[in-house]
Amino acid sequence: MANEVRVARLESLIKDVINNALANEINDKIAKLARVTAVRLSNDLSVAKIFLDAHKRESMLKVLENVNKVSGLLRSKLAAEWTSYKVPELRFVIDETIDYANHIDELFKKIKQQEN
């Protein structure tokens, strides 16, 4: 297992490279809407789970689909910066943290209203 500092550094590198590529080097207008919010590497560094968000939450499935279409290009951009032995497989998922936080906020508002 890689040490925590190294893993954190590699996760940060992946986030920076993918965000930069999506913003500046991808021609797909829908994929450009995505931004990386977090990256989690597997223990053996072979898989990177990349959490995506977009300004328009209702279009996230289409954004995810288009990002997956350009994943090979994104992986090659990452390979140019990668310092470890093998570039990880990229797995893109929708980051549901914002939706969850909004749900919790709504619950707190309901509780506050019931107290008043």
From Swiss-Prot:
Pfam families: RBFA
Primary location group: cytoplasm
Compartments where found: Cytoplasm
Record carries keyword Cytoplasm: yes
GO biological process, one term: maturation of SSU-rRNA
PANTHER family: RIBOSOME-BINDING FACTOR A, CHLOROPLASTIC-RELATED
NCBIfam families noted in UniProt: rbfA (TIGR00082)
Summary of subunit composition and partner proteins: Monomer. Binds 30S ribosomal subunits, but not 50S ribosomal subunits or 70S ribosomes.
Function: One of several proteins that assist in the late maturation steps of the functional core of the 30S ribosomal subunit. Associates with free 30S ribosomal subunits (but not with 30S subunits that are part of 70S ribosomes or polysomes). Required for efficient processing of 16S rRNA. May interact with the 5'-terminal helix region of 16S rRNA.
Protein name per its UniProtKB record: Ribosome-binding factor A
Species of provenance: Ureaplasma parvum serovar 3 (strain ATCC 700970)
